[in-house]
UniProtKB/Swiss-Prot annotation:
Function: RNA-binding component of the eukaryotic translation initiation factor 3 (eIF-3) complex, which is involved in protein synthesis of a specialized repertoire of mRNAs and, together with other initiation factors, stimulates binding of mRNA and methionyl-tRNAi to the 40S ribosome. The eIF-3 complex specifically targets and initiates translation of a subset of mRNAs involved in cell proliferation. This subunit can bind 18S rRNA.
Organism: Aspergillus niger (strain ATCC MYA-4892 / CBS 513.88 / FGSC A1513)
Major subcellular location class: cytoplasm
Gene3D superfamilies referenced in this protein's UniProt entry, alphabetically: 3.30.70.330
Protein name as it appears in the record: Eukaryotic translation initiation factor 3 subunit G
SMART domains per record: RRM
Protein backbone atom coordinates (compact mmCIF):
# COMPACT_ATOMS: atom_id res chain seq x y z
CA UNK A 1 0.00 0.00 0.00
CA UNK A 2 2.94 2.28 0.76
CA UNK A 3 4.25 1.85 -2.75
CA UNK A 4 0.89 2.65 -4.20
CA UNK A 5 0.60 5.68 -1.93
CA UNK A 6 3.93 7.12 -3.02
CA UNK A 7 3.15 6.55 -6.70
CA UNK A 8 2.05 9.70 -8.49
CA UNK A 9 -1.37 9.78 -10.07
CA UNK A 10 -1.28 9.21 -13.85
CA UNK A 11 -3.75 12.04 -14.34
CA UNK A 12 -1.23 14.57 -13.04
CA UNK A 13 1.06 13.97 -16.01
CA UNK A 14 -1.73 13.95 -18.58
CA UNK A 15 -2.22 17.21 -20.47
CA UNK A 16 -5.77 17.97 -21.42
CA UNK A 17 -6.18 19.75 -24.75
CA UNK A 18 -8.60 22.65 -24.52
CA UNK A 19 -10.29 23.04 -27.94
CA UNK A 20 -10.91 26.75 -27.28
CA UNK A 21 -7.27 27.53 -26.41
CA UNK A 22 -4.74 28.64 -29.03
CA UNK A 23 -1.03 27.77 -28.96
CA UNK A 24 1.31 30.63 -28.05
CA UNK A 25 2.90 32.77 -30.75
CA UNK A 26 6.33 31.64 -31.93
CA UNK A 27 8.99 34.08 -33.14
CA UNK A 28 12.11 32.76 -34.86
CA UNK A 29 15.07 34.89 -35.96
CA UNK A 30 16.58 33.77 -39.26
CA UNK A 31 20.20 34.06 -40.42
CA UNK A 32 19.39 36.70 -43.05
CA UNK A 33 18.04 39.07 -40.40
CA UNK A 34 14.35 38.37 -41.02
CA UNK A 35 11.89 37.09 -38.46
CA UNK A 36 9.37 34.28 -38.89
CA UNK A 37 6.24 34.69 -36.77
CA UNK A 38 3.89 31.72 -36.39
CA UNK A 39 0.49 32.45 -34.86
CA UNK A 40 -2.87 30.72 -34.65
CA UNK A 41 -6.41 31.99 -34.98
CA UNK A 42 -9.97 30.80 -35.61
CA UNK A 43 -11.56 31.42 -39.01
CA UNK A 44 -15.20 32.22 -39.72
CA UNK A 45 -16.10 28.53 -39.59
CA UNK A 46 -14.60 28.12 -36.13
CA UNK A 47 -11.62 26.10 -37.33
CA UNK A 48 -8.11 26.63 -36.03
CA UNK A 49 -5.84 28.23 -38.67
CA UNK A 50 -2.06 28.53 -38.60
CA UNK A 51 -0.66 31.84 -39.90
CA UNK A 52 3.04 32.14 -40.82
CA UNK A 53 4.51 35.58 -41.52
CA UNK A 54 8.02 36.55 -42.51
CA UNK A 55 9.02 40.08 -41.57
CA UNK A 56 12.04 42.04 -42.72
CA UNK A 57 12.95 45.16 -40.77
CA UNK A 58 14.45 48.04 -42.73
CA UNK A 59 15.85 51.18 -41.11
CA UNK A 60 15.36 54.33 -43.17
CA UNK A 61 17.23 57.49 -42.21
CA UNK A 62 15.63 60.73 -43.33
CA UNK A 63 17.11 64.22 -43.20
CA UNK A 64 14.36 66.76 -42.58
CA UNK A 65 14.20 70.43 -41.81
CA UNK A 66 14.78 71.10 -38.09
CA UNK A 67 11.61 73.19 -37.94
CA UNK A 68 9.61 70.31 -39.43
CA UNK A 69 11.05 67.93 -36.85
CA UNK A 70 10.14 70.40 -34.11
CA UNK A 71 6.54 70.67 -35.31
CA UNK A 72 6.23 66.88 -35.25
CA UNK A 73 7.05 66.90 -31.54
CA UNK A 74 4.30 69.36 -30.66
CA UNK A 75 1.54 68.14 -28.38
CA UNK A 76 -1.78 67.57 -30.16
CA UNK A 77 -4.75 69.79 -29.34
CA UNK A 78 -8.47 69.98 -30.06
CA UNK A 79 -10.16 66.70 -30.89
CA UNK A 80 -6.74 65.05 -31.21
CA UNK A 81 -5.65 66.09 -27.72
CA UNK A 82 -3.98 63.26 -25.82
CA UNK A 83 -3.38 61.04 -28.87
CA UNK A 84 -0.01 59.56 -29.73
CA UNK A 85 2.40 61.45 -32.02
CA UNK A 86 2.02 60.96 -35.74
CA UNK A 87 -1.02 60.82 -38.02
CA UNK A 88 -4.09 58.85 -36.92
CA UNK A 89 -5.60 56.56 -39.53
CA UNK A 90 -9.16 57.51 -38.60
CA UNK A 91 -8.64 61.28 -38.99
CA UNK A 92 -5.69 61.66 -41.38
CA UNK A 93 -5.30 60.51 -44.97
CA UNK A 94 -1.64 60.14 -45.93
CA UNK A 95 -1.01 60.63 -49.64
CA UNK A 96 1.96 59.95 -51.84
CA UNK A 97 4.87 62.32 -51.39
CA UNK A 98 5.54 63.80 -54.83
CA UNK A 99 8.93 65.45 -55.26
CA UNK A 100 9.03 68.19 -57.89
CA UNK A 101 12.37 68.45 -59.67
CA UNK A 102 12.31 71.03 -62.49
CA UNK A 103 14.79 70.80 -65.33
CA UNK A 104 17.74 73.14 -65.66
CA UNK A 105 16.21 75.31 -68.40
CA UNK A 106 12.56 74.95 -67.40
CA UNK A 107 11.93 78.71 -67.64
CA UNK A 108 13.09 78.78 -71.26
CA UNK A 109 10.95 75.76 -72.14
CA UNK A 110 7.89 77.30 -70.49
CA UNK A 111 8.39 80.55 -72.41
CA UNK A 112 8.69 78.72 -75.75
CA UNK A 113 5.60 76.61 -75.05
CA UNK A 114 3.60 79.71 -74.17
CA UNK A 115 4.82 81.50 -77.30
CA UNK A 116 4.22 78.66 -79.75
CA UNK A 117 1.06 77.10 -78.35
CA UNK A 118 -0.72 80.07 -76.88
CA UNK A 119 -3.52 80.08 -79.42
CA UNK A 120 -3.92 76.31 -79.34
CA UNK A 121 -4.13 76.38 -75.58
CA UNK A 122 -6.90 78.97 -75.67
CA UNK A 123 -8.91 76.82 -78.09
CA UNK A 124 -8.47 73.82 -75.80
CA UNK A 125 -9.68 75.87 -72.86
CA UNK A 126 -12.76 76.86 -74.84
CA UNK A 127 -13.57 73.31 -75.90
CA UNK A 128 -12.70 71.38 -72.74
CA UNK A 129 -16.16 71.96 -71.23
CA UNK A 130 -18.01 71.25 -74.48
CA UNK A 131 -20.14 68.09 -74.62
CA UNK A 132 -21.45 66.13 -77.55
CA UNK A 133 -25.15 66.79 -78.12
CA UNK A 134 -27.41 64.94 -80.52
CA UNK A 135 -29.49 67.17 -82.82
CA UNK A 136 -32.37 64.68 -82.81
CA UNK A 137 -32.97 63.67 -79.19
CA UNK A 138 -30.55 66.06 -77.41
CA UNK A 139 -28.67 63.11 -75.91
CA UNK A 140 -24.94 62.97 -75.20
CA UNK A 141 -23.97 61.07 -78.32
CA UNK A 142 -23.25 61.82 -81.96
CA UNK A 143 -26.24 62.42 -84.21
CA UNK A 144 -25.12 59.62 -86.54
CA UNK A 145 -25.38 57.14 -83.64
CA UNK A 146 -28.81 58.22 -82.44
CA UNK A 147 -31.19 55.24 -82.21
CA UNK A 148 -34.05 57.46 -83.40
CA UNK A 149 -32.33 59.07 -86.39
CA UNK A 150 -34.70 57.26 -88.79
CA UNK A 151 -37.89 57.92 -86.83
CA UNK A 152 -37.56 61.52 -85.61
CA UNK A 153 -36.77 64.87 -87.11
CA UNK A 154 -33.95 66.98 -85.64
CA UNK A 155 -35.01 69.37 -82.90
CA UNK A 156 -36.01 72.87 -84.12
CA UNK A 157 -35.55 71.86 -87.75
CA UNK A 158 -37.85 73.80 -90.10
CA UNK A 159 -40.22 71.79 -92.23
CA UNK A 160 -39.87 71.47 -95.97
CA UNK A 161 -43.01 73.55 -96.54
CA UNK A 162 -41.55 76.53 -94.67
CA UNK A 163 -38.53 76.65 -96.93
CA UNK A 164 -40.53 76.74 -100.14
CA UNK A 165 -40.06 79.97 -102.06
CA UNK A 166 -41.83 81.30 -105.14
CA UNK A 167 -43.24 78.25 -106.88
CA UNK A 168 -43.97 80.20 -110.08
CA UNK A 169 -40.34 81.18 -110.68
CA UNK A 170 -38.48 78.75 -112.94
CA UNK A 171 -35.68 76.65 -111.48
CA UNK A 172 -32.20 78.01 -112.04
CA UNK A 173 -30.39 76.22 -114.81
CA UNK A 174 -33.54 74.57 -116.19
CA UNK A 175 -34.52 74.74 -119.90
CA UNK A 176 -36.24 77.99 -120.83
CA UNK A 177 -34.97 79.83 -117.77
CA UNK A 178 -33.62 82.65 -119.92
CA UNK A 179 -29.94 81.85 -119.43
CA UNK A 180 -27.51 79.83 -121.48
CA UNK A 181 -25.30 78.81 -118.55
CA UNK A 182 -25.60 75.27 -117.31
CA UNK A 183 -26.22 74.63 -113.59
CA UNK A 184 -25.74 71.10 -112.26
CA UNK A 185 -28.87 69.45 -110.86
CA UNK A 186 -27.56 69.38 -107.30
CA UNK A 187 -27.15 73.20 -107.38
CA UNK A 188 -30.56 73.98 -108.81
CA UNK A 189 -33.43 75.31 -106.75
CA UNK A 190 -35.10 72.62 -104.68
CA UNK A 191 -32.08 70.32 -104.76
CA UNK A 192 -31.44 70.93 -101.05
CA UNK A 193 -34.73 69.29 -100.14
CA UNK A 194 -34.83 65.61 -99.33
CA UNK A 195 -36.06 63.16 -101.90
CA UNK A 196 -38.92 60.76 -101.55
CA UNK A 197 -38.48 58.21 -98.80
CA UNK A 198 -39.20 54.58 -99.31
CA UNK A 199 -41.06 52.79 -96.58
CA UNK A 200 -38.46 50.99 -94.51
CA UNK A 201 -38.46 49.00 -91.32
CA UNK A 202 -38.66 52.19 -89.24
CA UNK A 203 -41.65 53.64 -91.10
CA UNK A 204 -44.08 52.09 -88.64
CA UNK A 205 -42.03 53.23 -85.62
CA UNK A 206 -42.07 56.72 -87.10
CA UNK A 207 -45.82 56.88 -86.54
CA UNK A 208 -45.92 55.15 -83.13
CA UNK A 209 -43.10 56.75 -81.13
CA UNK A 210 -43.90 58.70 -77.97
CA UNK A 211 -41.68 61.31 -76.37
CA UNK A 212 -41.87 61.21 -72.57
CA UNK A 213 -40.52 64.19 -70.63
CA UNK A 214 -40.24 65.14 -66.95
CA UNK A 215 -38.84 61.69 -66.17
CA UNK A 216 -37.20 61.12 -62.79
CA UNK A 217 -33.41 60.77 -62.55
CA UNK A 218 -33.89 57.39 -60.86
CA UNK A 219 -36.01 55.96 -63.68
CA UNK A 220 -35.05 52.71 -65.40
CA UNK A 221 -35.82 51.44 -68.90
CA UNK A 222 -37.41 48.30 -67.50
CA UNK A 223 -39.83 50.34 -65.37
CA UNK A 224 -40.85 52.49 -68.34
CA UNK A 225 -41.38 49.40 -70.46
CA UNK A 226 -43.62 47.88 -67.78
CA UNK A 227 -45.65 51.11 -67.56
CA UNK A 228 -46.30 51.40 -71.30
CA UNK A 229 -46.62 47.71 -72.19
CA UNK A 230 -50.03 47.73 -70.55
CA UNK A 231 -51.38 49.45 -73.66
CA UNK A 232 -49.71 47.32 -76.34
CA UNK A 233 -46.48 45.74 -77.53
CA UNK A 234 -43.48 48.03 -77.07
CA UNK A 235 -40.75 47.54 -79.67
CA UNK A 236 -38.13 49.91 -78.28
CA UNK A 237 -37.40 51.99 -75.17
CA UNK A 238 -34.68 54.65 -75.12
CA UNK A 239 -33.90 56.47 -71.86
CA UNK A 240 -31.39 59.31 -72.19
CA UNK A 241 -28.72 59.12 -69.48
CA UNK A 242 -25.91 61.37 -68.32
CA UNK A 243 -22.55 60.02 -69.43
CA UNK A 244 -20.81 60.69 -66.09
CA UNK A 245 -23.49 59.97 -63.47
CA UNK A 246 -25.47 57.41 -65.54
CA UNK A 247 -28.68 58.99 -64.26
CA UNK A 248 -31.67 59.75 -66.45
CA UNK A 249 -31.64 63.17 -68.12
CA UNK A 250 -35.40 63.67 -67.90
CA UNK A 251 -36.77 62.34 -71.19
CA UNK A 252 -37.29 59.05 -72.98
CA UNK A 253 -38.74 57.63 -76.22
CA UNK A 254 -41.20 54.73 -76.36
CA UNK A 255 -41.91 53.00 -79.70
CA UNK A 256 -45.04 50.87 -80.14
CA UNK A 257 -45.80 48.27 -82.77
CA UNK A 258 -49.24 49.78 -83.42
CA UNK A 259 -50.13 53.46 -83.60
CA UNK A 260 -53.51 52.91 -81.95
CA UNK A 261 -51.76 51.47 -78.90
CA UNK A 262 -49.43 54.47 -78.86
CA UNK A 263 -52.39 56.87 -79.03
CA UNK A 264 -54.11 55.11 -76.14
CA UNK A 265 -50.90 55.17 -74.09
CA UNK A 266 -50.40 58.86 -74.86
CA UNK A 267 -53.92 59.64 -73.65
CA UNK A 268 -53.66 57.61 -70.45
CA UNK A 269 -50.04 58.30 -69.46
CA UNK A 270 -50.02 62.06 -70.12
CA UNK A 271 -50.20 63.54 -66.62
CA UNK A 272 -49.45 60.21 -64.93
CA UNK A 273 -47.55 60.40 -61.62
CA UNK A 274 -44.28 58.47 -61.65
CA UNK A 275 -41.63 58.74 -58.93
CA UNK A 276 -43.12 61.96 -57.49
CA UNK A 277 -43.17 63.64 -60.94
CA UNK A 278 -45.92 64.22 -63.51
CA UNK A 279 -45.07 62.72 -66.89
CA UNK A 280 -45.59 64.67 -70.11
CA UNK A 281 -46.32 62.31 -73.01
CA UNK A 282 -46.70 63.33 -76.66
CA UNK A 283 -46.02 61.94 -80.11
CA UNK A 284 -42.46 62.45 -81.29
CA UNK A 285 -41.78 64.69 -84.27
CA UNK A 286 -41.97 62.81 -87.50
CA UNK A 287 -38.88 62.71 -89.69
CA UNK A 288 -39.20 64.67 -92.91
Amino acid sequence: MSKLGNRADWADDEEFDDPSALPPQQITTNKDGTKTIVSYRFNDEGKKVKVTRRIKTTVVREHVNPQVAERRSWAKFGLEKGNAPGPSFDTTSVGENIVFRPSVNWKLQAAEAEKNGGEKGSVKDQLKDKKVKCRICSGEHFTARCPFKDTMAPVDEPTAGGEAGDEDSPAAGALGAGTSSYVPPHLRKGAAGGGERMAGKYEKDDLATLRVTNVSELAEEGELRDLFERFGRVTRVFLARDRETQRAKGFAFISFADRSDAARACEKMDGFGYRHLILRVEFAKRAT
